[in-house]
Amino acid sequence: MKLTPREKDKLLIFTAALLAERRRARGLKLNYPEAVAFITAALMEAARDGKTVAEVMHYGTTLLTRDDVMEGVPEMIPDIQVEATFPDGTKLVTVHHPIP
């Protein structure tokens, strides 16, 4: 299977997000890379599902709370940017303060 660098990045994000999802389901608090992967993958899937950019941006702030992550992680993630594929093309989505 031949994948472009972008496709490889998407698979890496998905794999890290899957691990984060499983750890969260077991009651573990997510660390920085897990939290970023979890939110990023959810944003990409929401875009793929046909939500608008504004809906995806708002959705990104509802995925995790301070109780879901290790101490200090929310401050380490002032914003998340991801190029997501929407039905009308690829767009850059920025979520400010994704963990309120």
Swiss-Prot record:
Q: Name one GO cellular component term.
A: cytoplasm
Q: How does it assemble?
A: Heterotrimer of UreA (gamma), UreB (beta) and UreC (alpha) subunits. Three heterotrimers associate to form the active enzyme.
According to its UniProt record, this protein's enzyme class is hydrolase
Q: Please provide the record's keywords in A-Z order.
A: Cytoplasm, Hydrolase
- Cited InterPro entries: Urease_gamma, Urease_gamma/gamma-beta_su, Urease_gamma_sf, Urease_subunit
Q: What is this protein called?
A: Urease subunit gamma
The primary location reported for this protein is cytoplasm
One BP annotation, GO = urea catabolic process
Where does the record say this protein resides? Cytoplasm
Metabolic or biological pathway, per its Swiss-Prot or TrEMBL entry: Nitrogen metabolism; urea degradation; CO(2) and NH(3) from urea (urease route): step 1/1
Q: Which residues cross the membrane?
A: none
Q: State a single Gene Ontology molecular function.
A: urease activity
Look up the EC number in the record and give it: 3.5.1.5
